[in-house]
Amino acid sequence: MTTTYAVLSEGLEKNYGAVHALRGLDLAVAEGAVCGVLGPNGAGKTTAVRVLTTLTAPDGGSARVAGHDVVREAASVRAAIGVTGQNSSVDGELTGRQNLRLFAKLLRFRGEAARIRADELLERFELTDAADRPARTYSGGMHRRLDLAASLLTRPRVLFLDEPTTGLDPHSRNQIWAAVRELAGRGTTVLLTTQYLEEADQLADDIVLIDRGRTAHRGTPAELKALIGSYAEVVVPQASALIPAAAVLDQLTGAEPVLDHERRTVGAVATDTTLTLPRIVRELDAAGVPLIDASLRPPTLDEVFLRLTGRGDGRTSPPLKETAA
């Protein structure tokens, strides 16, 4: 069966003076899929969104969104997409209802159509009770939901979400996640950039890891986790046992261990698929390392990112580096 791509880029390049923001970025997002684009600050995520949404022209390569070239058919691309960026587009002095009606009129909704569509979206995003309050009185999560509602006024085929939950509390983040799941269930293609690896794990059908403007790896969450094997972690009773435990894990896994003094844990990615938990326990015992607990589990996306790019993110789990005592 032939796959139809809602977003397709090949060798995408973008420079800002001497800064190479995109260095041959390749993306392929199937229609109706949720694609998570991951990377640390400066990786090129926002630049990629700006190019794909026609806000800035590429310096090389090509890209098509909803079947249209982002350079030659920019107007057609804009008619087919919705965008929610990192910065709110909401006017704080207007009410939520007024904001949506204003956006609708700017999008050339006629007559009662603007009112009807605004009311539909206010209800859909649970903003009806606050619809007639100034948006400046909204919480961060409500602002984001109003932004998302505005991006859906035209029922876009493709929705771009650029770090939509950055700075939100867990409850507000879960509300945005629920909205994205609902959109995906209705067949909307979603390209989501995020620094929160748990977010991509929860929402994305496919994940693209971007590092320094290039596509580092891509695949489903399960496929990416399978690339690096399991994650071994041990808990020791005192800080003095961390270094000896790290030496054992280093020998067993061949990967640099991660020490967390506060939690008194040592962890390392185990690429050796034959490594077992009993062997880990035996080797620690043979080395005289006291032990409270040990585990061998599938890796998180944090650990995948660290292993595949050589640097961690640490936004949703303990930082992937040695922490201070």
Pin down the residues of each PLM region.
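ABC transporter nucleotide-binding domain
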Residues: 177-271
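C-terminal coupling/interaction segments
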Residues: 272-325
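A short linear hydrophobic-aromatic micro-motif
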Residues: 127, 254-258, 290-295
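Preference for bulky hydrophobic residues occupying beta-strand positions
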Residues: 14, 27, 234-236, 268, ...
